[in-house]
């Protein structure tokens, strides 16, 4: 039988079909499986872009160590990205930046950061998400990983009494010199027991908390390991990317560096970090307007919406070390030492390769995973694609980690890399001055906009090429294919579109306009508050807002199957509602959820419909809607709002509490969930209670109710009620016995049906 797709239009109204045309309404694709391939690709790219073969054996780990700074060999290929940083150029750019911002700019920023760091409590490290835990060698929540590290200090040396971030940092540096580190580890022991009845042997796995210890060399590698995962939820990309999470030994030092970089970013007008939202838009607007003030009458500007290719692979920790040394040159010795630790640790990092590579035979009938530590042994089984990835890196791999002295992994030093990017935007030299050209722009991590200013087109070309050359010196590669230039005040920056002023990207907010599905009372009020917010942010014009309101209304009615009382729409729910409406005189006071009409318009978006219709309601109807004793009435302080991108927004619930503010409950039994272990424990507890009660009859113990199916629960309840009625005298003994017999028969039937 053929399926005609146009049949879809017969049974659905237009507004419900909008969701089929809009691609952002579904969840983004998740990545699953092994992340080894993506990690190997990242490492191989980092080594390729270094454009050098200068290597020296590392004294600590005895692995060849590639040099990533001041040693560019392949200078011909101008298209391929370069990650080789020229340190003297970098320091020159930092000096220009300080001159422009005023003498002592860096010193002042570091002093601000220092006062904050000295007060900082080390529990701030629990704020992160997933963190690599070096004791169990897998990812854990940040708070757990921190606790396990503190436990390791306790096992080796005694309790950790520090409270501030500095004391924690000092302890981490001490730890790197310890000859042996002890830590807690959960091990599973297999216990064998003989069953007395059958005589068979039963194996049970018992988790036991033990204490493990590792030597100095092994601990160093674990401390410097960065775990990798595949990035989740990326739209419009076929290939996945690897993201990284460092361990709890590197975290405190990177936190300190980011604090210093944040203080600098706050004062740079070209930086898009760390502010966000409307504040960010205002900051960018001032940068654009100040550009117009700097231009002469014969000059004009071109906007380049830029894209940097392979930002992370071309960032070098050695370059960061030099930059931080320059930033802290006039500061205290404490800050000089603290800021140098994080880049040095990243210069010696090991990257965890993940689960391994999956193989299948030619018929695709069998699958096997080669674990990361055994890849060298079985490389003859790999496909060509994997072999070409693995063989150049073989000399850097130790067990399941790979030594990577250069390159950053995704999401490490966002603020510091912004400082590095802004330093190129501050560049000025004699040749540019002579031609009457200059540039400025905006930078936010790897995203940037360039405003090139000159008096004629050939000079504009020259200026842009000059900018590209300056960037190449410090490992920033502007992608010439993906960047595009346009007329003044037309650009895109961090998903914000600018055309004289910021134009909203309404597509991202569309899913929030739809019915949230909480309940009839909250849904429409929540949608109205979102439309109101978007009108305040200049995202919606009045006519578009009115259209959005009408679409919300249509979808609300389609979701809850409630249509206007005079629409003559037939349906199971409308039958009941129409009977109820006949009893009401003033039909203007009906709520939308009871078959009423829309009373709100753009000027009354902030007023809930219950308030507007309050005066027009019949007294009887009003008392029924706003009845505090009604069991359905319930109020939530906040409401979750879903968006196409970014996290779920939690907003204040402005809805008026009425009979429609009900909360639906899901009925789930424990039997089909992962609570079975809990149930087994409860049964054991019940057994112990019964034994105890049989010995000590006067003991006051509350025995657990135990696991019950719904059928058993109903029987138990009925018996209890019948007994209570008999005690009061509402029913006689003969009736009580009859009820007991009926329940016994039902129980028997239920057990037999199993």
Curated annotation (Swiss-Prot):
One of its GO terms (biological process) is symbiont-mediated suppression of host mRNA transcription via inhibition of RNA polymerase II activity. The keyword Ribonucleoprotein does not apply. One of its GO terms (molecular function) is RNA binding. It holds the Pfam family Flu_PB1. It is an enzyme of class 2 (transferase). A motif (Nuclear localization signal) lies at residues 189-197, 205-218. Keywords: Eukaryotic host gene expression shutoff by virus, Eukaryotic host transcription shutoff by virus, Host cytoplasm, Host gene expression shutoff by virus, Host nucleus, Host-virus interaction, Inhibition of host RNA polymerase II by virus, Nucleotide-binding, Nucleotidyltransferase, Phosphoprotein, RNA-directed RNA polymerase, Transferase, Viral RNA replication, Viral transcription. It comes from the Viruses. Its main location: host cell. Phosphorylated by host PRKCA. Its EC number is 2.7.7.48. Residues 288-484 form the RdRp catalytic domain. GO terms for cellular component: host cell cytoplasm; host cell nucleus. Residues 251-258 are annotated as: Promoter-binding site. It is found in: Host nucleus; Host cytoplasm. It catalyses: RNA(n) + a ribonucleoside 5'-triphosphate = RNA(n+1) + diphosphate. Belongs to the influenza viruses polymerase PB1 family. Influenza RNA polymerase is composed of three subunits: PB1, PB2 and PA. Interacts (via N-terminus) with PA (via C-terminus). Interacts (via C-terminus) with PB2 (via N-terminus); this interaction is essential for transcription initiation. RNA-dependent RNA polymerase which is responsible for replication and transcription of virus RNA segments. The transcription of viral mRNAs occurs by a unique mechanism called cap-snatching. 5' methylated caps of cellular mRNAs are cleaved after 10-13 nucleotides by PA. In turn, these short capped RNAs are used as primers by PB1 for transcription of viral mRNAs. During virus replication, PB1 initiates RNA synthesis and copy vRNA into complementary RNA (cRNA) which in turn serves as a template for the production of more vRNAs. This is RNA-directed RNA polymerase catalytic subunit. The lineage of its organism: Viruses, Riboviria, Orthornavirae, Negarnaviricota, Polyploviricotina.
